[in-house]
A protein has these predicted regions:
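Active-site micro-motifs of SAM-dependent methyltransferase domains
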Residues: 88, 159, 199
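Short acidic/histidine-rich active-site segments
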Residues: 117, 146-170
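Mid-to-C-terminal alpha-helical segments outside catalytic/metal-binding sites
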Residues: 168-206
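Outer-membrane beta-barrel pore domains
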Residues: 128-129, 160-167, 180-184
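Extended, charged catalytic domains and RNA/DNA-binding interfaces, predominantly
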Residues: 1-116, 120-122, 136-143, 150, ...
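C-terminal helix-coil-helix/basic helical segment that borders enzyme active sites and/or dimer interfaces
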Residues: 124-126
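Conserved residues at the C-terminal ends of beta-strands
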Residues: 20, 154, 195
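Soluble non-cytosolic domains of exported or imported proteins
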Residues: 44, 129, 133, 167-171
């Protein structure tokens, strides 16, 4: 994509732009590529992309970006980047998951992380041992270690092949919130379900 292509997509109604996918591109270094080579972060063209996205009030998604890319964007962007569908390295140490440093930055800037339901992001254990309870435990950990305000659900249902073993599809997502009930306040559960993302979305788009 060129910057012109990005502008065309925005004109068509796109409101969230991820700077790269699993492979690095002209704009940014990806998390996967950074793990096997040099993490160059954001390119000069990527910095221009951030300027355009800021001008157009577009949410910048760093779910697939390297740590250096995330912090480069954080340094120059009017609004913090979001992790729309990621995991947590504390539980599964893979490049696509968020480090404590990234999570601390998300907390301090009022951004959010959407917890990905991909079993291989949640744990190294066999899928049969990865359940709704696994997701709940990670949400509770993040709520206590950082803040419940950073939390959302970033299921990635259209991008993953498998779900936790006791989930069949989107119809089972309410199980997560049922398990959270009583362990978090009603306000905090509503935040994970909708309110936190909506708050962040409107803060960037307004």
């Amino acid at each position: 994509y060129s910057l012109y292509d990005v502008e065309l997509l925005i004109d068509e109604g796109v409101s969230v732009v991820t700077v790269c996918w699993n492979n690095s591109n002209r704009f940014a270094t990806s998390a996967v590529d950074a793990a096997s080579g040099e993490d160059r972060g954001l390119s000069p063209l990527g910095r221009e992309l951030v300027r355009i996205l800021n001008d157009r009030k577009i949410i910048i998604d760093c779910s697939h970006a390297s740590d250096a890319t995330f912090f480069d964007i954080l340094d120059i962007s009017d609004k913090p980047p979001v992790l729309s569908h990621s995991g947590v390295r504390h539980f599964r140490n893979i490049p696509r998951n968020a480090s404590d440093e990234v999570l601390s930055a998300i907390e301090s800037t009022g951004s959010i992380i959407g917890i990905n339901l991909c079993p291989s992001f949640l744990s190294r254990r066999a899928r049969k041992h990865i359940t709704v309870q696994t997701v709940v435990e990670q949400i509770l950990y993040l709520s206590e270690r950082f803040s419940p305000d950073i939390l959302a659900l970033g299921s990635d249902l259209e991008g993953i092949r498998y779900l936790p073993s006791d989930m069949k599809g989107v119809e089972d997502i309410p199980l997560i919130f049922e398990r959270l009930s009583g362990k978090m306040s009603e306000e905090a559960v509503s935040g994970v379900a909708f309110d936190n993302f909506f708050r962040f979305f409107t803060s960037v788009r307004e």
